[in-house]
Amino acid sequence: MKITSIKLNKNGKYVVTIDNEKYNLYQDTILKYLLFSKKEIDNTLFENIIKDNNFYDAYYKIIKFVSIRLRTENEIRKKLNTLFILKKDQDKIINKLKEQGYLNDELYIKSYINDKINLSLEGPEKVKRDLLKNGFKEEDILKYLCLFEDINEERINKIINKKLKANHNLSKKMFIVKVGNDLRNLGYTNYREILENIDFDDKDIYQKEYDKIYNKLIKKYPPEKADILTKQKLYTKGF
């Protein structure tokens, strides 16, 4: 087999003609195998050229993939799987990315936590769970989870106040239960004392709910019984 021509293409790759067949090769491949016009190559060398060029092709696709935003190792491996890259070659690409600074666990964790703080109301425990699912080590996560410490109470109060404004029918007792569940699902833990001390007068809500239930029951029962049944229903609602 013989290389008959090598021409630089507009996309930065080289069009290499070998025995009248054209191949798009990366500069890395050209330099690694010292390819030049009229060079003779055997089948083994040809196979290695194609194999390595496929490796570089996957590598540069991943470079483009990580240039859009920071990626986790899991995300990169999933992308490499879609490109049908073998495990050993995946490991080589991952190591190369780490060496060149494209893949940095601590940088990703810090950036992820800052985004969650600035763009969401998620709490530290949920953020920690999500990062663990992405394959990060707990000790690395804990280094930056402390970013929540000074703002935790402020964020909890913000969520509670938002829920208070939207509450039109819950008693204080049921409100505390519901919002407590919401806060726990959002990843907060130290919220109980804050919730217990909220300024919440549910008298108006009680009266509104009483009137709504009573007006339905009075159509079926005498006033005294309607009153008793109404209060029983309100009791089950935490009033």
What label would you give each PLM region?
Residues 1-239:
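An alpha-helical, amphipathic repeat domain used for nucleic-acid recognition
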